[in-house]
Amino acid sequence: MSGNTTNVHETRAKFAETLQPRIGGNTTKVIRAALEKNEAESGVSEDNDNGSLEKVNVATSPLLTSTPPTISKALVKLYPYLILIDEFLNVVTWTGKNIWSSVLMLCLFITTVEYFETLVKYFGHLAIIAILWGYSLLDNYIEGTLSSSPTLEDIALLMNRVSLKSDILLSPMVNLGTQDIQRLLYTTVILSPIYVMITWLLLPPRSLMLMVGMFLLTYHSPWSKVARRLLWKFKIVRLLVFYVTGLDLGGINKDQGIFATVQKQVKKLASTENSNGVLSDSKPIRFTYVLYENQRRWLGIGWKPSMLSYERTPWTDEFLNEAPSPENFHLPEETNTMVWRWVDKTWRLDMTNDGAIQVPNSKARTSADPSPDEGFIYYDNTWKKPSKEDSFSKYTRRRRWVRTAELVKTSDFDESVINSNRNSAIEQKVEENSTNGLTAEQELGSNKQEKDNAKKVGEPTTEETKEFAEASNINEGEFERISSTDEEVLKSRARDRLAKVLDDTEEKEQSNPTIGRDSKKAV
């Protein structure tokens, strides 16, 4: 080996330093300093020479032990922007602790729109300085928030608040589907001439922008919610919204709320269909619809369904949502595989009013024809202090109506309806024939050869089978399907019908010989 010593310099690879976000300062250092300060105040001091966030042990943060370091780093880097988004949502949704920030935003918007040209002409150069100054204030605010809330629990709570406020902000649009957007687009295109006339004659573009902006910025304000709720009680307002947007936002079909739970169950059933479109469970599913009848006492008039404009409507569901009266109540829309039908013939009054009234065991708990004052719970003028007895201090009352419906598959429903309609139609037709004194020849038809064949074989003719289908309210396509799948049932019903006609003829033969001779000729 050579005696010359060679100095070897080791060069280690280093990762390029990632760009730290400027807003709120260096997030990692700010949070680390806050954690060290909290530890020092709590008497738990540890050496953190390398300054890594992962080596800071915080007793109040159990999430650190279960959260991967990669996720923790991502949350820490996202934390300043979550604070910024949370403050923006506070202002827009009017949910902050200080409501005046939202009011200031509204005033700033109005001033900018009304005096935009003047502001740009005389104060445009100062606007850039104002933006930089606002950014500096925002940077200091975020840095202070990072120092006061440096744990993962604070980040998780902030993410939850941002999620809830985002849902509030987007709540007017989450219920709009693709078809609703298409309908809104068509309506907007059709109303384009009216829009042009309004912007040309009545509202200039600046005024229109001001009105639309104020409506959007104050949509979630408390007084705006109250005003919309009061205006929505007027039918003319609901009709105006319907004709302008083309959307039924609960104004025309006001009973949407009562079907909310039912629609969720129907969607759940539809999702359980297999690849052949057949439900795994063919049993009908029953729903009990509940309507509450509300009345108010008027001096000199008595109990009437006329309610005050700001309170509940004469008919509501159990959640006080507006609902139709029993006479105007209709079942939800049918689907391709499921249909609705009533189990109870009529609406029945719940005499117990959902258990609030004790009913003797000898008395029925429901009644289809109650008296005008049965089943009511009485309240004071503000719907408080419920009582089973009426008194001079009671000015409002309500009672509970129930009716059960069931949801069945289309195939099961068609078979049951067809059979019931067929039986009732056959019985009705035989009764009419017996009343009118028709002979068996007139009933079976004029084709003698086909009647003789039917007599020999003991089966109905094709003409009679079609006649039964028409009597059962079956269309042509349904008749073809039943003719191929349920032919034996039709033939059996026809034989029963023929037997009934012959039995009636024999009975009339004993009472009237003329009818007997005509019947023998026909047979």
Swiss-Prot record:
Spans annotated as Disordered: 429-523
Composition bias type Polar residues, residue spans: 433-447
Entry annotated with the keyword Transmembrane helix: yes
Residues carrying Phosphoserine: 52, 420, 424
Keywords on record: Acetylation, Membrane, Peroxisome, Phosphoprotein, Transmembrane, Transmembrane helix
Transmembrane segments: 91-111, 118-138, 184-204, 207-227
Principal subcellular localisation of the protein: membrane
Compartments in which it is found: Peroxisome membrane
Family (UniProt): Belongs to the PEX28-32 family. PEX30/31 subfamily.
Record protein name field: Peroxisomal membrane protein PEX30
Gene that encodes it: PEX30
